[in-house]
Amino acid sequence: MAGRISCCLNLPPLDSNSAQSLASLLKTTSKISCRRTENETEPRKNKCSFVLGVAATVVIGGIQINDVASVEAAVVKSPVEEMAAGVVPPRRWSDKRTCPPWLENSLETIVPENLPRPSAHRRLELAGLAKGDAPPVGVVMTRVNRGGCFSV
């Protein structure tokens, strides 16, 4: 939907030869123009339609705000109501702890809740330094290893 609002003020013309003082300009009040346009098929563009547009916007905005508040009240329940209704929250991995609780000044790494931890079966001894030197830059060297390993 496209719309256009135009407003004209009936201000007195100002020219450099005018002898009107600033006080006389301040005493005159400007009025909003209510003239119709040349094309009578266009909707009325005057202060009445502007006021109606503003009033409609306020009413629709009030309805929307009321609607959002009522939907929020109906959908969002407090945790106390959920506990009273018998809804059990899902179990967290920290509730299934196998080690003793964290002690102050221990060097345990604190991982945020519900983030995956590295596997406990991983062994760092399997990774080691290569026995040979690195190949020089620009040379690609591949070896065939028949021991069930692969090369990258």
From Swiss-Prot:
Residues 1-22 form a transit peptide. Induction: Induced by abiotic stresses such as salt stress and methyl viologen (MV)-induced oxidative stress. Triggered by NAC072/RD26 during senescence. Down-regulated by cytokinin. It comes from the Eukaryota. It is found in: Plastid, Chloroplast membrane; Plastid, Chloroplast thylakoid membrane; Plastid, Chloroplast envelope; Vacuole. GO terms for cellular component: chloroplast envelope; chloroplast membrane; chloroplast thylakoid membrane; intracellular vesicle; vacuole. It is a single-pass membrane protein. GO terms for biological process: chloroplast disassembly; leaf senescence; response to cytokinin; response to oxidative stress; response to salt; response to water deprivation. The keyword Protease does not apply. The chain crosses the membrane at residues 48-65. The keyword Amino-acid biosynthesis does not apply. Mostly expressed in senescent and mature leaves but not in young leaves. Triggers stress-induced chloroplast degradation, independently of autophagy and senescence-associated vacuoles. After targeting to the chloroplast, triggers its destabilization and subsequent disassembly, inducing the formation of CV-containing vesicles (CCVs) carrying stromal proteins, envelope membrane proteins, and thylakoid membrane proteins which are released from the chloroplasts and mobilized to the vacuole for proteolysis. Interacts with the photosystem II subunit PsbO1 via its C-terminal region in the chloroplast thylakoid membrane and in CV-containing vesicles (CCVs). This is Protein CHLOROPLAST VESICULATION. It comes from Arabidopsis thaliana. The gene is CV.
